[in-house]
Amino acid sequence: MENPTVFGKIIRRELPADIVYEDEEFIAFKDIRPRSRVHILVCPKEYIPTLADYPDTPEGALKLGKLMLTATRIAKQMGLEGYFIRIHVGEKGGQEVFHVHVHLRSDA
């Protein structure tokens, strides 16, 4: 299924974004409405709507682990001394874009 979200459009370069990191599996870009001094969105290029849609399998765990490690790698590359990582799950959990993503934020 083609990713219909704004993140899919960024991945396909149909919309501009301030990209801070990209590899074969992930892309990270600055949030257009930052809530911290540093506010980066890290998402897999594979379209997965929510965290709850990851399979409860070793492969799903590996994909989630890579997502978290990618966010950590970006924080290190940016020289962040302190940060937090947040994932909203579902509409009731505050998720606005239905393509799983990590908020990497810091005011440090």
PLM regions: where:
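HIT superfamily nucleotide-processing domains
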Residues: 1-108
